[in-house]
Structure formats: C-alpha cells, structure tokens
Swiss-Prot record:
Primary gene name: uppP1
Transmembrane stretches, start-end: 43-63, 85-105, 109-129, 184-204, 214-234, 254-274
Keywords: Antibiotic resistance, Cell inner membrane, Cell membrane, Cell shape, Cell wall biogenesis/degradation, Hydrolase, Membrane, Peptidoglycan synthesis, Transmembrane, Transmembrane helix
Disulfide bonds: none
Sequence similarity: Belongs to the UppP family.
Classification via NCBIfam families: PRK00281.1-2, PRK00281.1-4, undec_PP_bacA
This protein's record includes keyword Glycoprotein: no
Functional summary from the UniProt entry: Catalyzes the dephosphorylation of undecaprenyl diphosphate (UPP). Confers resistance to bacitracin.
CC per GO annotation: plasma membrane
Protein's name in the database: Undecaprenyl-diphosphatase 1
EC number: 3.6.1.27
PANTHER family: UNDECAPRENYL-DIPHOSPHATASE (PTHR30622:SF3)
Key word Hydrolase present: yes
Primary location class: membrane
Length: 276
C-alpha cells in the first residue's frame, strides 16, 4: 500500500463518517469525492462496504444502552416488542425494492449529475418540510405507531436514488408523519442499523470475490476513520438539533448541488466521465 492509496482511504473514510448520518447523502459525497480522487474499480466497491460497516458500528456504540434495554426487554416489555416491530416494518420496504431495483439504479443513476440534482431537490423538500406546520404525536421513539414506521420505511426507499440521503429521507419523512425532530432523528439512526447491515451483508456476499488480503490495510484505514468520524457526526447532530432546524443542511445541499451542476454546465469538470 503506497502513501497515496492510504491517503485516499483516509479521506473517503472521513467523508463516509461525517456524511452517513447527516441528511446530505453519504453516497452522493462518496461518488463525487471518489471521482475527484480517481478511486474506483473493484477495490472501491469492496471498500465502500467496509467503511459503511465502520459508520454503522459508531451508531451501535452510541446507542448501545438503548439496544441492550430492548434486547433484554423483548420477552417481557411491550414497549421493547413494539419498538422492534416498528424497526422491522420500516426496514421491509427497502429490502423488497432494494433487491428488485438496486442493480438498475447503480448502473443508470450512480453518477455525479444525478447526485447533484437529487441534492438540490432534496434540499428544497427539506426546507419545505421544516417550514410546514405539522402536529407532533410522537415525542420519543417508543411512541411511534406502526403506520408511522411503514411510511418512514417507504420514505427511506427514496434514498436508493444517490444524492437523496437515507437519513434525510427518513428524518424528513418522520417530521411530516408526526414525529418530533429529535425522535425522527433517533429513529433514523436506529433504522440505519438493520438497513445498512443488511445492505452490507447482501453486497458483501454478492461481491465476495473482490475482498482480497492485499487490500485489507486499505480497508482497515477506511473502517477506523469512518467509525471515528461517524461518532463525531452522530453526537454533533443530536446536540445540534436540540436548538436548530435542518435548514442549514438543506441550504448546504442546494448550494453544493448547484456548484456541481455549474461545473458540469460550464465544462469546468467532466463529471459525465465519472464511473460508478
């Protein structure tokens, strides 16, 4: 492993960690940054699976007490069973649609122009959702109804389009469906666990031949970096939403997306040459 490859792994690990749980699309940022760094091919596909596992481990660690309480309480506590059922209900739409459409979406939509357009559209929707008046009926994740979970699950499916953002879709969906900002954010984090682990296991098995021992040092750098920066992002976001809305993230999406579109329109960067 040369120094440049290690630096690529470090940068992409930071990008994954910081963006995975913020409503700004980690996949979109990965596509753009990987293209700028010329990091692609089979190694990149395997690398992305590994760094996503690093990011999700950060959420598992951050919410380990809640997870342990739920596991212990499953046999006797209705609230634990309801919480688990809601996660499964919200998880199922992504499983079904992901298996059906994942390859088509990866082939046709995994490019910086799609990402830029989705960033802008998602930012506009986020601003609208924040300004829209909606009644809150769930102040904690234990108060979420199964119908809320199902609708959030379908909202999560929008994130199959790169640039949309899985966390953005589920958080904004939660706000629109009656969850408080904190509850929508926390449920998005919990929903990420089965969704991302399931996607990683599916992709890992599908592309198992891409994992070669020579790349393990690169994977290790990305995994550890993603874990550390995802932890920072999760804690920072939970603190941020205590006194702020998601408007700042919406404007970031819009500006970033417009910059990418402008560089493409004026020919400053040949984004159309990017490979998934």
């Amino acid at each position: 492993m040369d120094l440049w490859t290690a630096l690529q792994a470090l940068i992409l690990g930071v990008v994954e960690g910081l963006t995975e749980f913020l409503p700004i699309s980690s996949t979109g940022h990965q596509i753009i940054v990987a293209d700028l760094l010329d990091f692609g091919g089979e190694r990149a596909m395997a690398f992305n699976i590994i760094i996503q596992l690093g990011a999700i481990l950060a959420v598992v660690w951050e919410f380990r007490r809640k997870i342990l309480d739920v596991v212990i309480g499953l046999p006797t506590q209705p609230s634990a069973r309801r919480f688990t059922a809601n996660l499964l209900i919200a998880f199922l739409p992504a499983v079904v649609l992901g298996v059906i459409f994942a390859d088509l979406i990866h082939h046709y939509l995994f490019n910086p122009i799609t990402v830029a357009a989705a960033l802008v559209v998602g930012g506009i929707v986020m601003l609208w959702a924040e300004q829209r008046q909606h009644e809150v009926h769930a102040e904690t994740v234990d108060e979420i109804r199964w119908t809320d979970a199902l609708k959030i699950g379908f909202a999560q499916c929008l994130a199959m389009i790169p640039g949309t953002s899985r966390s953005g879709s589920t958080i904004i969906g939660g706000l629109l469906f009656g969850l408080s900002r904190k509850t929508a954010t926390e449920f998005s984090f919990f929903l990420a666990m089965p969704t991302m682990v399931g996607a990683a296991v599916y992709s890992g098995y599908k592309y198992r031949d891409l994992f070669v021992p020579a790349d393990f040092p690169v994977f290790a750098i990305g995994f550890v970096t993603a874990f550390i920066f995802a932890m920072i992002a999760v804690r920072g976001l939970l603190k941020f939403i205590g006194s702020h809305s998601y408007a700042a993230f919406a404007w970031y999406r819009i500006v970033f997306g417009l910059v990418i579109l402008a560089t493409w329109q004026f020919g400053w960067v040949d984004w159309t040459a990017a490979q998934p």
